[in-house]
């Protein structure tokens, strides 16, 4: 049987695995589903059409599944889907999607969401992402796997943060960060390849060397973006361990709608 504190409120219709723990004064809404071994801290609110997987830890006073901060929202039954093994610390806010987008906000698996983080409507956060304290994601932001966002940073709506990239603390990001790149500042500018992070995740020396070469093409050689794309295509077909990550970088750049940081 679920271990629910007597002061907590679980509305009829909520579906909680029998191993879920709910702390004092927490509120669980009628359309919420919570998977096995998840713990919900005291005074937290999980509402809306929200689904959580297994082994999540929700800190006290977190607000999960709240209404989108979008004036066009008209009480449509939009959703929030959270995977498994996420840590969501105290006072974090995560909102459901809007019908103007896909109607769903998503958070993958194994993410570390620190205190006071905001994840706005229609955001899509991948796996193994770290969002440091007070990082603020506007609506429609997409964050790739293994990305890190520093504390006190603000991310503009519709911005994409590429996989394995890192945004330094107290930064203001208004355009896309390509995968594997370090960025920082107000406004955020590129500061090299995330070499240490790539080493920790098992990228080969050849792959890292290829990404460094790609970074020089994109940022150091004085090329226009279109000129840089031509050279990146050549690097992406050189043969070796570097081809796949350079292809990933190139595909991200070519798909950018807001433009990449430069």
Curated annotation (Swiss-Prot):
Gene3D superfamilies: Hexapeptide repeat proteins, Udp N-acetylglucosamine O-acyltransferase, C-terminal domain. It is found in: Cytoplasm. Belongs to the transferase hexapeptide repeat family. LpxA subfamily. One of its GO terms (biological process) is lipid A biosynthetic process. It catalyses: a (3R)-hydroxyacyl-[ACP] + UDP-N-acetyl-alpha-D-glucosamine = a UDP-3-O-[(3R)-3-hydroxyacyl]-N-acetyl-alpha-D-glucosamine + holo-[ACP]. Keywords: Acyltransferase, Cytoplasm, Lipid A biosynthesis, Lipid biosynthesis, Lipid metabolism, Repeat, Transferase. GO terms for cellular component: cytoplasm; membrane. This is Acyl-[acyl-carrier-protein]--UDP-N-acetylglucosamine O-acyltransferase. It comes from the Bacteria. InterPro entries: Acetyltransf_C, Acetyltransf_C_sf, Hexapep, Lipid_A_LpxA, Trimer_LpxA-like_sf. One of its GO terms (molecular function) is acyl-[acyl-carrier-protein]-UDP-N-acetylglucosamine O-acyltransferase activity. Its EC number is 2.3.1.129. Pathway: Glycolipid biosynthesis; lipid IV(A) biosynthesis; lipid IV(A) from (3R)-3-hydroxytetradecanoyl-[acyl-carrier-protein] and UDP-N-acetyl-alpha-D-glucosamine: step 1/6. Involved in the biosynthesis of lipid A, a phosphorylated glycolipid that anchors the lipopolysaccharide to the outer membrane of the cell. Homotrimer. Disulfide bonds: none annotated.
């Amino acid at each position: 049987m679920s271990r629910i504190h007597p002061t907590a409120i679980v509305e009829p219709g909520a579906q909680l695995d029998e191993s879920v723990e709910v702390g004092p004064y927490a509120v669980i809404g009628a359309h919420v589903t919570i998977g096995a071994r998840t713990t919900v801290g005291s005074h937290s609110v999980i509402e809306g059409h929200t689904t959580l997987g297994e082994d999540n830890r929700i800190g006290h006073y977190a607000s999960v599944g709240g209404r989108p901060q979008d004036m066009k929202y008209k009480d449509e039954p939009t959703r929030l889907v959270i995977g498994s093994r996420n840590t969501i610390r105290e006072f974090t806010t995560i909102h459901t999607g809007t019908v103007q987008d896909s109607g769903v906000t998503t958070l993958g698996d194994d993410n570390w969401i620190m205190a006071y983080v905001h994840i706005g409507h229609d955001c899509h956060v991948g796996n193994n992402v770290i969002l440091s304290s007070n990082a603020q994601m506007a609506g429609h932001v997409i964050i790739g796997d293994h990305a890190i966002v520093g504390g006190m940073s603000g991310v503009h709506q519709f911005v994409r943060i590429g996989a394995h990239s890192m945004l330094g603390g107290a930064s203001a990001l208004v355009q896309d960060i390509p995968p594997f790149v370090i960025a920082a500042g107000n406004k955020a500018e590129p500061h090299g390849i995330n070499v240490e992070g790539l080493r920790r995740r098992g990228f080969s020396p050849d792959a890292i060397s290829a990404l460094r070469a790609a970074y020089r093409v994109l940022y150091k050689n004085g090329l226009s973006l279109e000129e840089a794309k031509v050279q990146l295509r050549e690097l992406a077909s050189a043969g070796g361990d570097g081809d796949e990550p350079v292809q990933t970088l190139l595909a991200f750049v070519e798909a950018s709608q807001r433009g990449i940081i430069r």
